[in-house]
């Protein structure tokens, strides 16, 4: 089975190499690069990356490389959204860290049935030792909980801090939610 998968992956990469990178990467290279800088320099992300590297299994391309890619792209989307709204650098930094945490952990239980639910529960436990406030941990929990494609999502009550209405991680909705709540007394950033 692994040989078949390896051949399929190799062929898929050959096909992809024939085409230019998606416009997103060209049009938003500043955001991708800035997100990568946050990813590579933030101590919370560095510590979480070490944890994920030790605990994630590669499951048909959903291993560490995939988690890093999702985290960096999530951060880029957050940067784009925040630039449009005009939030402060401090607030942007915190949002980027939160979505990058969600990106790193979103497939931590990938090999399990109902991996989004189990992964969200696992992430909630793991993140208790990180310098994140309870609301931030809950935001990460709900992003992971609702990320799985082709599965129904749980409608998140506004009091639970995160609105997701899709079958996979919708970083733009996380951004929109934070944008609405940035000045709310409910949001507390360290």
Where are these regions (language model features)?
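Short glycine/proline-rich turn/loop motifs
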Residues: 49-55, 102
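Generic alpha-helical secondary structure signal
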Residues: 43-47, 69, 139
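Active-site alpha-helix of zinc metalloproteases
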Residues: 98-102, 143
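Post-HEXXH active-site segment of zinc metalloproteases
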Residues: 114-126
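Divalent metal-dependent phosphate-bond-processing catalytic cores, especially two-metal-ion Mg2+/Mn2+ enzymes
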Residues: 1-36, 56-94, 105-111, 125, ...
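Beta-strand segments within the central parallel beta-sheet cores of soluble alpha/beta enzyme folds
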Residues: 136-145
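Active-site-adjacent bridging/hinge elements
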Residues: 41-50, 95-98
């Amino acid at each position: 089975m692994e040989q078949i998968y390896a051949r399929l992956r190799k062929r898929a990469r050959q096909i992809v190499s024939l085409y230019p990178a998606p416009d997103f990467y060209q049009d938003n290279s500043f955001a991708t690069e800035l997100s990568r800088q946050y990813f590579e320099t933030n101590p919370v992300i560095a510590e979480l990356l070490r944890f994920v590297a030790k605990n994630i299994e590669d499951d048909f391309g959903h291993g560490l490389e995939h988690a890093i890619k999702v985290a960096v792209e999530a951060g880029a989307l957050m940067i784009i959204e925040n630039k449009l709204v005009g939030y402060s650098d401090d607030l942007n930094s915190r949002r980027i860290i939160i979505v990058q945490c969600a990106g790193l952990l979103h497939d931590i239980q990938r090999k399990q049935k109902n991996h989004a639910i189990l992964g969200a529960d696992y992430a909630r436990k793991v993140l208790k030792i990180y310098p994140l406030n309870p609301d931030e941990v809950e935001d990460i929990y709900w992003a992971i909980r609702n990320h799985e494609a082709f599965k129904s999502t749980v409608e998140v009550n506004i009091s639970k801090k995160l609105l997701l209405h899709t079958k996979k991680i919708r970083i733009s909705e996380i951004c929109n939610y934070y944008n609405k709540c940035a000045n709310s007394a409910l949001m507390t950033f360290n």
